[in-house]
Amino acid sequence: MTETLKTGIPAVDRYLGTGYDQVRGFSSRYSATICGHLLRRQSELGIRGSVAEIGTFEGRFFIMLGLAVGEGERAYGFDLFAWPGSQVLERLLANADAHGLARDRFTPLSFDTGKLTAQEFSNLTGGAPLRFIHIDGDHFPKALTQDLRLSLIHI
């Protein structure tokens, strides 16, 4: 018998159990579960702050992030929202609505992180250190290096 892994965050566990596979994306449920568990553990230890995802796409992993953050925290989602078509942002918003992620808990940001300075990234994410950043944007070395650089400065 295989036991399903849980994060310990009821809203996240519900989403992972019944909604995750309904949202188009590339991140595995396993990775989302492990990251959700990490976010819960951070909260238990008093580590607070907003979170971000670079490469939000239609929200598969991002919805988990948004459901995991606590009161006064936000999820920031960076994407161009243009691939594979022009309706990606609308699908993200519809997916968030369908899976219980309230719009006042997240901010989709249509920016190319490869062109952002550290200060611009900080301004867009509230100016405070982020407690978690998921990088799943452009996978080419130059772009990934830039995303890692932005993340390292803001964690």
For each of these PLM feature ranges, what is it?
Residues 4-29, 36-153:
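S-adenosylmethionine/decaboxylated-SAM
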